[in-house]
UniProtKB/Swiss-Prot annotation:
Pfam families: Ribosom_S12_S23. GO terms for biological process: translation. Residues 106-135 are annotated as: Disordered. The keyword Methyltransferase does not apply. One of its GO terms (cellular component) is small ribosomal subunit. Residues 113-123 have a biased composition (Basic residues). This is Small ribosomal subunit protein uS12. GO terms for molecular function: rRNA binding; structural constituent of ribosome; tRNA binding. The keyword rRNA-binding applies.
Length: 135
């Protein structure tokens, strides 16, 4: 604990907060162009092929972004929108691609949590896709 004299001599410094998504430069989203689309494996104890893309942003950064949802239409030179948000089991992946905007199509046949995957509301007259539903 500092003395009053020490506080007069040197005031308290506020802790500097470090951003978790520096490539966004304080913006909620950023546009970018995919330079490489590939799959990678998560760290232990998980096992899968996670879909990720290397994206060159308008802010000048090149980052690795996760492609959420089942299936995607992204390839090299696709224009995408990214947001912050890391993937816990993929080291170095601190951004998510926003589905349903620009060249990233929404997830097909998505019934629940549609807004997170850019899926439109299904028409009420269509046949139900979930055949395993019980009464």
């Amino acid at each position: 604990m500092p003395t009053i004299q020490q506080l007069i001599r040197e005031e308290r410094k506020a802790a500097v907060r470090k951003t978790k998504a520096p490539a966004l430069k304080g913006c909620p989203q950023r546009r970018g162009v995919c330079t490489r689309v590939y799959t990678t494996t998560p760290k232990k104890p998980n096992s899968a092929l996670r879909k990720v893309a290397r994206v060159r942003l308008t802010s000048g950064f090149e980052v690795t972004a996760y492609i959420p949802g089942i299936g995607h239409n992204l390839q090299e030179h696709s224009v995408v929108m990214i947001r912050g948000g890391r993937v816990k089991d993929l080291p170095g992946v601190r951004y998510h691609i926003i589905r349903g905007t620009l060249d990233a199509a929404g997830v097909k046949d998505r019934k629940q949590g549609r807004s997170k995957y850019g899926a439109k509301r299904p028409k009420p007259g269509q046949a139900p896709a979930a055949a395993g539903k019980k009464k």
